[in-house]
């Protein structure tokens, strides 16, 4: 029996069903690489970021995620080289899909029990996404933003449902906008942490705080 089409598993039904000691014999997810390109680039090198954002609540199989990653990665390498971007898959396929195999040959009713005991066995894995979930992100320099948009548009075609490609106002993969990042960097309140940053908070004696100066 061949693999069932992914449209059979597109709608999320029931509770999440992850791999566990009660759920064994699960095949590995097809996607194994979640970061591509120049992964070790510092946060300063790629200030612009483009996302694929989901517009539906659905399940996306690991095969679709891997196909999208390959399409985006190949397009970016072709046009801007492998050292000019950092591509990241933002969702993980934890949910296990099941199949209750049915025979379709003559005399199948003698060989199987039909819908009796129809819980099914593990078939593959899928990621559960909501409206507004970010599926893929790529950070680049300003001249390469148009190539990032084109690459993620090609990757978007590998998914079911509706998605959109958006250019974020954030600095790279951080939670800060580019204006906030520049201001905090000038104030020397940022500590680089790989592709992200840590913000140094206000610490010290209470006399420094504006609130206690007014009392």
UniProtKB/Swiss-Prot annotation:
PROSITE patterns: RIBOSOMAL_L10E. Pfam families: Ribosomal_L16. SUPFAM superfamilies: Ribosomal protein L16p/L10e. CDD domains: Ribosomal_L16_L10e (cd01433). Belongs to the universal ribosomal protein uL16 family. NCBIfam families: PRK04199.1-4, uL16_euk_arch. This is Large ribosomal subunit protein uL16. It comes from Tetrahymena thermophila (strain SB210).
């Amino acid at each position: 029996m061949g693999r069932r089409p992914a449209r059979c598993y597109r709608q999320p039904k029931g509770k999440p069903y992850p791999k566990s000691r009660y759920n064994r014999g699960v095949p590995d997810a097809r996607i194994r690489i979640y970061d591509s390109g120049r992964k070790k680039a510092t946060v300063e090198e790629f200030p612009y970021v483009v996302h694929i954002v989901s517009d539906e609540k659905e399940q996306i199989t690991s095969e679709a995620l891997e196909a999208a990653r390959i399409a985006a990665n190949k397009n970016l390498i072709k046009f801007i080289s492998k050292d000019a971007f950092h591509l990241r898959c933002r969702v993980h396929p934890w949910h296990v899909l099941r199949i209750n195999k049915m025979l379709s040959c003559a005399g199948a009713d003698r060989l199987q029990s039909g819908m009796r005991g129809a819980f099914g066995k593990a078939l593959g894995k899928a990621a559960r996404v909501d409206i507004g979930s970010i599926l893929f992100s790529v950070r680049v320099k300003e001249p390469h933003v148009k190539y990032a948009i084109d690459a993620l548009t090609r990757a978007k075609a590998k998914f079911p449902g509706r998605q959109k490609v958006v250019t974020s106002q954030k600095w790279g993969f951080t939670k800060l906008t580019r204006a906030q990042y520049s201001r905090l960097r000038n104030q020397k309140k940022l500590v680089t942490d790989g592709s992200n940053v840590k913000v140094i908070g206000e610490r010290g004696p209470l006399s420094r705080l504006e609130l206690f100066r007014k009392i």
